[in-house]
Amino acid sequence: MKLIKNGKILKNGILKDTEILIDGKRIKQISSKINASSSNIEVIDAKGNLIAPGFVDVHVHLREPGGEHKETIESGTKAAARGGFTTVCPMPNTRPVPDTVEHVRELRQRISETAQVRVLPYAAITKRQAGTELVDFEKLALEGVFAFTDDGVGVQTASMMYAAMKQAVKVKKPIVAHCEDNSLIYGGAMHKGKRSEELGIPGIPNIAESVQIARDVLLAEATGCHYHVCHVSTKESVRVIRDAKKAGIHVTAEVTPHHLLLTENDVPGDDSNYKMNPPLRSNEDREALLEGLLDGTIDCIATDHAPHAKEEKAQPMTKAPFGIVGSETAFPLLYTHFVRRGNWSLQQLVDYFTIKPATIFNLNYGKLHKDSYADLTIIDLNTEKEIKSEDFLSKADNTPFIGEKVYGNPTLTMLKGEVVFEEEK
């Protein structure tokens, strides 16, 4: 057994002194004081820090199979554990794509061999993510895939998305969508606005995202499908999702830390560490995202952790791949910028990473109580640390946040009662 002493948990927004007794994989007792005298008990000193439920990230890219030069299941899940995550859901833009039962089984085998945290894989919506032929939803659902998505690309035709939603309803699984109309991208590498004009870099307009969301929420209404929108980035998208929810359509949405923290004006020049998809938008868009998150239009935060090799990101923005890493920096950045400055409560932030994503996808994770799995993370809210690439457990360090000084760093993460990350002393 394990006993975590000298910790604090959030109860109705208030930090309470807490000890947690763990028996095997599950929590046996949570109390302000636990008297356990057995010599078999391993004591973990939380040192007065927060004990939070293990975080749930419904949007990561682990790159394996096919992209192991960028990231592997092992390195990506080590990075997740360092960031406090105990459950991650990897996107299907791998090679091969998890679009058949055989490919999903091969992926699960890899996961079972090297994953450091719980991994719930998505299956693709269309074969090879080519947008022309649906996967076998029934067989893949029976195989236990988390949900269906073609993330990395948008489903370009309404007829294909309509057919996919009807199949998803039959198997009672969500459709998760990267919303991007290819006919409106115009070869863009950042947001289309004043800053892109100043830099002479082609831009992607807001409507490339929002028109596809508008299309899809109507299809979701017609089919009754649970439709989840990935990485919302524009004010128009927030408005469409808000209106859809008011109309009773089953739509949920996520937002990334970088879209909450940065705008097009933060792009210093031709620096591919500021290139992600969707791109960093205007400050007006960022404010709409913050408002949407706080009023419940946007349901949760997801990292869209997207690692790339150094040589790939060393290219100009017009040639480099989209994406930044985020698993190891998400919570500290948001805690530092929003909670410490009094804009959010600590309870709100923890919920965005735990119970909110778990609830919208009907996952029995993201909470701490008697008999639940001992999935948790201990977080130091008071010590300032600098984000350094040499500290990353990910294979990649493509992020604009290197050098930022942050609070709220996880010091230990536990999955089913086993320590999967512990800060070096």
Swiss-Prot record:
Protein name: Dihydroorotase
Gene Ontology MF term list: allantoinase activity; dihydroorotase activity; zinc ion binding
Gene (UniProt): pyrC
Function according to Swiss-Prot or TrEMBL: Catalyzes the reversible cyclization of carbamoyl aspartate to dihydroorotate.
Cofactor binding note from Swiss-Prot or TrEMBL: Binds 2 Zn(2+) ions per subunit.
Biological pathway: Pyrimidine metabolism; UMP biosynthesis via de novo pathway; (S)-dihydroorotate from bicarbonate: step 3/3
Binding residue positions for Zn(2+) 1: 59, 61, 151, 304
Record organism: Staphylococcus epidermidis (strain ATCC 12228 / FDA PCI 1200)
Entry-linked SUPFAM superfamilies: Composite domain of metallo-dependent hydrolases, Metallo-dependent hydrolases
Active site positions: 304
Record's keyword terms, sorted: Hydrolase, Metal-binding, Pyrimidine biosynthesis, Zinc
Cofactor(s) demanded: Zn(2+)
Catalytic activity: (S)-dihydroorotate + H2O = N-carbamoyl-L-aspartate + H(+)
